[in-house]
Amino acid sequence: MASMAAAIAASRTAVMSANRPLDDRERKRFTYFSSLSPMARKIMQDKEKIREKYGPEWARLPPAQQDEIIDRCLVGPSASAPGDPEELARFPGLRGPTGQKVVRFGDEDITWQDEHSAPFSWETRSQMEFSISSLSIQEPSCSTAGEPRPPSKAPQGSQALRAPQGGKSSSLDALGPAWKEEEASFWKINAERSRGEGPEAEFQSLTPSQIKSMEKGEKVLPGCYRQEPAPRAREAKAEKPSPLRQEQRAAPSVSTECERPQPAQACASPPSEAGPSGPMGKPVSPEVMEAVEDMEDALFLEPVPVQVSSSNVILKTGFDFLDNW
């Protein structure tokens, strides 16, 4: 508010001292610009002094001539005009034409062209020197760059780490078929694992020892990790005399009576092996037991799919005891 009051007082003083009074438009303009800042108020006061100096002739001058008079009076005669020879003496870099300034290094005969004295351009040196002939020269190099390069000697692990996410398939192909086989076996094992995790798990691949361990609460390995019977045991069983087989055929009822306590195995056996059920009254000879063991091994080597729900409890049998003896 103080600056506004000072501007109004200055404008009143200028109006009273002038030969002609300011109109309402000029007064508002003078008041507004005088209230912006102290420097603006000083400029407006200097302009009023110039107008007072010229008197009534100031109103008859064209606006362009008024601006020229104001600029000349405000700057002062001491300011040098552009192109003044005194300026060239103070700034020797402005003497020579741009882009042709040569720099000499002391007393030695070393000269170079000043790169900063060149005319300004938005383009770089490579863009200014670009031509069609440079393209024709670079064509053979581009064609050689497009040719397949020999594989690098870096290890495969580092190549797989350096490969970007977009080029993952190319890095996998470079690792070779061994890696693909590894990945295939990995997914196969996962599929076998997930097969035995659901509520409708299949128990046809479980051995009696695995069933017993499940009843005890121990962790059972899946079928893909189970060790197959040794070839020596197979050969020994194959070399057994044929009279055992004949005894097995002669007494089918005894074998069915031994198999009766296993409900899951009774369902899995073919209908030809099922015989009339009866109470176990006679003791079983060891030869017949060995024959039954051979049948059990044959059943587990070639499993038949059995639909067993998870709610059923598989009972412990004598075969389980003999298997873990």
Swiss-Prot record:
Task: Name positions with the PTM N-acetylalanine.
Answer: 2
Q: Which UniProt keywords apply?
A: Acetylation, Cytoplasm, Phosphoprotein
Residues modified to Phosphoserine: 37, 126, 171, 285
| Low complexity compositional bias, start-end | 1-18, 261-281
Compartments where found: Cytoplasm
**Bias kind Basic and acidic residues: ranges:** 229-248
Gene Ontology CC: cytoplasm
Highest taxon of the source?
A: Eukaryota
Q: Does the keyword tRNA processing apply?
A: no
Q: Where is the composition biased (Polar residues)?
A: 133-144
Region annotation Disordered: residue ranges?
Answer: 1-21, 76-100, 133-177, 190-285
Q: What is this protein called?
A: Uncharacterized protein C1orf198 homolog
Q: Organism, per UniProt?
A: Bos taurus
